[in-house]
Amino acid sequence: MFGVISSGMVAVMSQNIGAGRPGVAYQARQLGLMFNAVMGILMSVILAVFSGGILRIVSIAPALFEPAETYLKIVGGACFLNALIPIYSSYLRVFGYTKHSLIGTVVGNLINIILNSVFLFVFNWGVMGVAAATVISRVVNLLIVAGMGAVLIKAKQSPERIPSRKILAQIVKIGFPSALETALYNVAMTLIVRFMNQMDADGMNVTARSYAMQIANFSYCVGAALAQANAIMTGWRIGAKEFEECDRGTRKAVLYGLITATCFSVAFALSGHFIVHIFTDDTQMINLVVKLLIVDIFLEFGRVTNLVYGQALKTSGDAIFPVIMGAIFMYLFAVVGTYFLGIHMGLQAVGAYIAMAGDECARAVGMVLRWKSGKWKSKSLVEL
């Protein structure tokens, strides 16, 4: 639910900034802030009050119940912070203050590390100390990004305003499909992991996937960063009706992403035997992870294309198409493909990775064709 608002809010704010209407962007932030605050407080109360019941539903081991309940009451009871931080961070980023948003995250993480050490090894507070450190670090992160936004951005003083109902409708129009796509992805990944658990009795295939994902995340982070930066610039340019510049910028971001992702993934595949030794000395496991890293070259090629074009389409207002592509290909290729190649054909984790790579590449083709069609140009949220 938090993602519904924050992703839609970025599209609305960035387009209005590009259209020279920072006051409307401020309105969008206020609406997003109020909505997420209400939902965050509601979720905090639910997690704090019903933490024990929630843990019983997921059948947590009896030995872990008490510490898990303590942690969930403290961290879950403060989950409204998770609802507010993305709003203020997005507000900074869409106005171009990306480094300042990063400062809040870095300082918060450093404080978390320091307080974890103090609470665990000096005060011996155990799980309660870890939970307290997490909450305090998030409070600091929130104060930093909220304070910087108030000092650096003066959109509140801008006179432009439109009906709040219209802004909320635009936010939901973009945010709901984005959240639905994320939900579909999570369900698909759950099914894939379930199939992979059926491939062997000792969990080698699932563990190999976990190792490969940890290594490939370095490549993914580059693609995600480029997609996020390009999405903001896409919103600015669409708001200003600079469609040709928007098209060139997105193509350039995809090119940079493909070059970077390919270099990373090829390097990881070539040096896989050395890297995987960090996690395990099991020769069979190392060989399996290296095979996954080789397939991951093609997976990352498709994924970075999806990320950049998909985010650009959503920010432009064309948010339905990526959901349709995800609903079709994530299940047709990734889920069904994992079962067919991994279990039926006996390729196991390698088959699952081939299926996931096929999903990413198929969706990438669809995203490219959709972008080239130019239909996103008519989806603008701003009327000049």
Question: Which functions belong to the PLM regions below?
Answer:
Residues 8, 85-88, 128, 156-164, ...:
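Juxtamembrane/interfacial segments around transmembrane helices
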Residues 1-45, 82-101, 193, 206-272, ...:
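Small-residue-rich hydrophobic transmembrane alpha-helices
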Residues 3-10, 74-93, 101-112, 130-145, ...:
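Short runs within selected transmembrane alpha-helices of multi-pass transporters and secretion channels
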Residues 74, 108, 137-141, 149, ...:
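Transmembrane helical elements of multi-pass membrane transporters/channels
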Residues 113, 146, 150, 190, ...:
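A short secondary-structure junction motif
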Residues 51-54, 115, 187-196, 230, ...:
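Hydrophobic/aromatic end-of-helix segments at the C-terminal termini of transmembrane alpha-helices
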Residues 13-80, 122-176, 234-299, 341-384:
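Short alpha-helical transmembrane segments in multi-pass integral membrane proteins
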